[in-house]
Amino acid sequence: MNIATSLTLTGLAISAAIFWLNFRPWWKGSREPKALIPFGSGFALGAVATVCTGGLLGWLAGCSAGVANSAGERGVRAVTGAAGSGALARGDLGQLTPEGAVIVFLMTVGVFLAWKAAGKQDKKRMAGGGFCGATLCVTAGVASLLNWLPGSLNTAGEQLRAAVEGAGIL
């Protein structure tokens, strides 16, 4: 994981607010599962970005917690006058293999293409999902809930490699 900053309680408040701003219209509206796809795809990419040890995704994930903490500190202080709190318990999703990294790359391309085709509102939801995924997955609780994700990516990459190399086909 390429994240030097732990999420603070005020950073969590910002992530929770962004999550609620994206979830509430769906809850109050039709509750169609397909309406969650923009936020969910962004969240998934943000979550896997925390597993990246470098590159653009790793850098963006590393910056997200710091941005959330800074914005949360200012927001909470402006609204309540109270000072911020210490860092929350850190979590780690695990490691990517080279095969898993290929799956993350393909996933990034897919989300980027969806971003290019999306309308303004869906782009906001995708960005919010990415931010929430990158910030919440550095906490111990969310990382524990999603600890299956890197293994799934690595396995999918290994299966892709085996299929391309001809192992186990027919």
Predicted regions and their residues:
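Alpha-helical transmembrane segments of multi-pass integral membrane proteins
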Residues: 139-170
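Hydrophobic alpha-helical membrane-insertion segments
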Residues: 41-62, 131-147
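Hydrophobic alpha-helical transmembrane segments
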Residues: 81-108, 167-170
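Hydrophobic, membrane-inserted alpha-helices
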Residues: 106-114, 130-133
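N-terminal signal-anchor/start-transfer transmembrane helix
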Residues: 8-29
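Interfacial/capping segments of alpha-helical transmembrane domains
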Residues: 56-75, 145-156
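Structural signature of hydrophobic alpha-helical transmembrane segments
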Residues: 1-14, 92-104
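Alpha-helical transmembrane segments and their helix-start/interface "positive-inside/aromatic belt" motifs
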Residues: 24-49, 119-131
